[in-house]
UniProtKB/Swiss-Prot annotation:
Keywords: Oxidoreductase
Family: Belongs to the short-chain dehydrogenases/reductases (SDR) family.
Coiled coil: none
Protein name: Post-translational flagellin modification protein A
């Protein structure tokens, strides 16, 4: 589905990013690996090159830096002469992320979370839109979450050390609307923008949480990163050429 398509993946070393890069390569596309962590990036590059017997471009990328974004875009274009799609699966967090409850968080801590994550997604989309306008076409997919679409099921967190972060929900809701706003503003430019809101991704969560979460779903419950990659490939392919401005939910029915 992605033959000869050049796909720039930000956050390539995360669970979803890594799974997506593999899926792109399996579908005969070319994945550009971009991440802020150079050590993880080097490991991923070696792993994928060994598995797929193909030389890949890896780039250090900080989505909160316009200079970093432009440098990465320039390097990608210099190598491939085009970028067909941009997927942002980055997950920038502040030093206190996940450590402080909402009611105890300071203004500065709240702003740090919003600025890094939502601000970074806005900035990255801004720079890729500029590039895609010059190229005369493009495809942007931002990764979001069901937490930006539905209210949390707070009861699932009872008797665990986990919590539902208000900042996270606000960030993801903002990313959803970023996609709709951009898609509408970019009518008649041959640039599509969509958002994928995924259900929870398995990451060694407590069994009590997993059991409660599973009861809210149709068949599996928490998903593996690979479970959402088919939808991402569809959005990156020409099969979805008339899909824009949408937030596609992949959550095994959790939101019902």
């Amino acid at each position: 589905m992605l033959e000869n398509k050049i796909i720039f993946v930000a956050g390539a070393c995360g669970r979803i990013g890594k799974a997506l890069c593999k899926k792109i390569l399996q579908n005969k596309g070319i994945a550009i690996l971009a991440d802020i962590n150079e050590n993880h990036l080097s490991i991923l590059k070696t792993e994928l090159e060994n598995e797929f017997k193909k030389e890949l471009l890896s780039l250090r990328l900080d989505i909160t830096s316009k200079e970093s974004l432009n440098c990465a875009i320039d390097q990608a274009f210099e190598k491939y002469s085009k970028i067909d799609g941009f997927v942002n699966s980055s997950y920038p967090v502040g030093k206190d992320w996940g450590k402080i409850a909402y009611y105890e968080a300071s203004y500065e801590q709240i702003c740090e979370s919003l600025n890094l994550h939502l601000g970074g997604f806005i900035l990255a989309s801004q720079e890729f839109v500029k590039f895609f306008k010059k190229q005369s076409y493009g495809n942007i997919i931002n990764l979001s979450s069901i937490m930006g679409v539905f209210a949390p099921k707070f009861e699932n967190y009872e008797n665990t050390t986990m919590q539902s972060s208000l900042e996270y929900s606000v960030i993801k809701a903002g990313i959803n609307h970023l996609g709709a706003w951009l898609a509408k503003e970019l009518f008649n430019t041959n640039i599509r923008v969509n958002t994928l809101a995924s259900g929870g991704i398995l990451d060694n969560q407590a069994n009590i949480f997993l059991e409660k979460y599973r009861k809210c779903c149709a068949s599996k419950g928490m998903l593996d990163a690979e479970d959402i990659c088919g939808t991402l490939v569809f959005l990156l392919s020409d099969e979805s050429k008339f899909v824009t401005g949408q937030t596609l939910v992949v959550d095994d029915g959790w939101g019902l």
